[in-house]
C-alpha cells in the first residue's frame, strides 16, 4: 500500500514538473503605453494589458509596465528587481522604454526619469539585456509606439517617432536609433513597433486614429481598441522574428475598427 501511495505521489510530482516545464512566460516592462489599467476609471488601456489575448493558454504574460516610468526610473525604483526575482530560465522579457526618457528633452532629468539617449538610456538598455541573460532569460527590445503627432501631409512627425533631433540627418536625440544600435551590439531581437504603429495610423488616417486608437484628448495613450490593435502588432512582430510563433493566435475576435 505504501508503495502505491509513493507511485501516485511521484506521478503527481512528475506531472507538476512537466507542466511547469511546458509553460512559457513572457514578462513585459515599460511605461503607461504598455501598462494595465483599472476598468471603469479611465478610457486608457496599455497594449501590454491586451497582449495575453494573442497567445494560446500555454503562454503566460506578466505585465510589469507602470505609468510615468523611464528606463532609468523603472530600474532605480526597484521594479526591475521584482522582475528578476520572478524570472526563470527560458523566460522572455520584452523591453519598451522611451516616452518618459524624453521628458527632459534628451537630458538626464533631476526627477530620475529623463535620460540622455546615447549615454544613460543606452546604459540602462544594456543593463536589462545583461541582467536578463545572466538569469537565463531571453531579452527582446520593442521600440516605443508612436505618439499621435500628425503633420499636414498625414504622416507622423519625427518627434512622434521619438526622435527629438532638430536636423533630419541627426541621430543625436533619436531614442529608437539607440535601441536598435544596442540591439545590434548585443544581438538582441527587435520588434519595431515604432515603424508598425506609424504605418498603421498613417494608413488609418488622423480622424479615425483620434476617434478609435488614442484617447481623443491625449496624443500618447491608447484606448481599448488602440491597445488591442497595438498588441496584435506586437504579436505579429514576434511571429515575423520566428519568436513564440507556434503560441501566437491569429484572427482574434477582439478588434473592430471602422475605417
Q: Where on the chain are the PLM-derived regions?
A:
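Intrinsically disordered, low-complexity boundary segments flanking structured domains
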Residues: 13-14, 48-52, 177
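N-terminal, helix-rich and Lys/Arg-enriched segments in bacterial and organellar proteins
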Residues: 6, 28-35, 51, 137-139, ...
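Glycine-centered flexibility sites
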Residues: 30, 46, 63-68, 98, ...
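Alpha-helical cap/lid subdomain in secreted, periplasmic
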Residues: 3, 79-224, 228, 232-250, ...
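Bacterial Sec-dependent N-terminal signal peptides
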Residues: 1-23
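Serine-esterase "nucleophile elbow" of acetyl-processing enzymes
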Residues: 20-65, 81-93
Amino acid at each position: 500500500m505504501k508503495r502505491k501511495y509513493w507511485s501516485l505521489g511521484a506521478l503527481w510530482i512528475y506531472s507538476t514538473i512537466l507542466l511547469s516545464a511546458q509553460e512559457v512566460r513572457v514578462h513585459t516592462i515599460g511605461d503607461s503605453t504598455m501598462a494595465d489599467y483599472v476598468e471603469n476609471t479611465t478610457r486608457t488601456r496599455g497594449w501590454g494589458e491586451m497582449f495575453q489575448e494573442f497567445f494560446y493558454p500555454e503562454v503566460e504574460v506578466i505585465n510589469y509596465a507602470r505609468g510615468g516610468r523611464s528606463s532609468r526610473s523603472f530600474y532605480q525604483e526597484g521594479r526591475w528587481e521584482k522582475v528578476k526575482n520572478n524570472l526563470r530560465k527560458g523566460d522572455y522579457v520584452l523591453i519598451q522604454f522611451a516616452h518618459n526618457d524624453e521628458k527632459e528633452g534628451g537630458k538626464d532629468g533631476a526627477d530620475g526619469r529623463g535620460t540622455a539617449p546615447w549615454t544613460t538610456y543606452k546604459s540602462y538598455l544594456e543593463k536589462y539585456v545583461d541582467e536578463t541573460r545572466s538569469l537565463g532569460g531571453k531579452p527582446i527590445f520593442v521600440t516605443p509606439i508612436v505618439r499621435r503627432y500628425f503633420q499636414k501631409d498625414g504622416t507622423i512627425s519625427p518627434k512622434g517617432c521619438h526622435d527629438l533631433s532638430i536636423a533630419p540627418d541627426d541621430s543625436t536625440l533619436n531614442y529608437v536609433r539607440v535601441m536598435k544600435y544596442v540591439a545590434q551590439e548585443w544581438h538582441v531581437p527587435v520588434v519595431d513597433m515604432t515603424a508598425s504603429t506609424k504605418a498603421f495610423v498613417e494608413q488609418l488616417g488622423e480622424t479615425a486614429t483620434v476617434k478609435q486608437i488614442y484617447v481623443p484628448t491625449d496624443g500618447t495613450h491608447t484606448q481599448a481598441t488602440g491597445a488591442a490593435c497595438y498588441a496584435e502588432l506586437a504579436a505579429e512582430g514576434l511571429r515575423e522574428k520566428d519568436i513564440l510563433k507556434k503560441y501566437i493566435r491569429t484572427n482574434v475576435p477582439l478588434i473592430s475598427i471602422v475605417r
